[in-house]
Amino acid sequence: RNLIRKAERSRARDEGRVPRQLDDLDFLLGVSDDTRQGALRFRTPGSDKFLGEPSRVPRLVALPELLHASDELASDDDPSDAVKRLLDTGTTGLGGARPKASVRLDDGSLAIAKFPHSSDSWDVMAWEATALDLLATAGVRTPQHQLTQVGNRSILILRRFDRTRDGVRIGYISAMTATGSSDGDQKDYADLAEAIRDLSRSPVQDLHEFYDRIIASIALGNTDD
C-alpha cells in the first residue's frame, strides 16, 4: 500500500494536483495482475482483459538495480524513479514488512527477492535463509530458495508458493482472513487451528503441519508470527 500511495503522490506532483484519497479498490487494481497474490483476479463484465497495473518482471540479473531502488525508496521521502522501477516489476502485490521485488528465475517461474534494509545491523536475509534450511532439514515444507550476494549484501530469493512451475495460480487466504480478524486483533494458535478444521480440505494433515511449524517457531525463537 505504501508503494501505491507513493506512486499516487508522484503522479499528482507531475500533474500539478492534490493526491487522491485512495480506497480499497484503488489498492486492489493498483497491483499487477501478473504478480497478484493467490488466484483472485479482476475484470469488467464482458471483457476478457484482467485489470491491474502493467508489469515487466525482471530476471535475476537485475538484482543490483532493484536493490538500489529499494534503498532509495527507504531513504527518500518521494523517490519517483525508485517507485517507478519497483512498480514496473509488479512489486505492489507483495505484502510484508521487508523490502522486496518480483523477479523471474532462470526457468521463467515467478519468485520474490527479499532485500536487506539499509538500517539492518545484522545480516537478516542470511539468517532467514538459515532458518529455512533448518526447517527443511527437520522435514517442514519450505519454498525453494537461494541466497545470493550483491556486493557484500545478502538477498534471499524465494520461489512463489502460489504458482506452479507452469504459472498456474494457486488460491490461498491468510491466517487473518481465515480467523475473520483485522490487523491488530489478538488471536492465538487455537483460533487458527479451529479455522483449519473448518476450512481445510485435509484438516488432519494440515493440523499436523501447523503443529510442526509452531514447534519450529518456538525452537527458532520466532516472535513475529
PLM feature segments, named:
Residues R1-T223:
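Phosphate/dinucleotide-binding and metal-coordinating scaffold of catalytic cores
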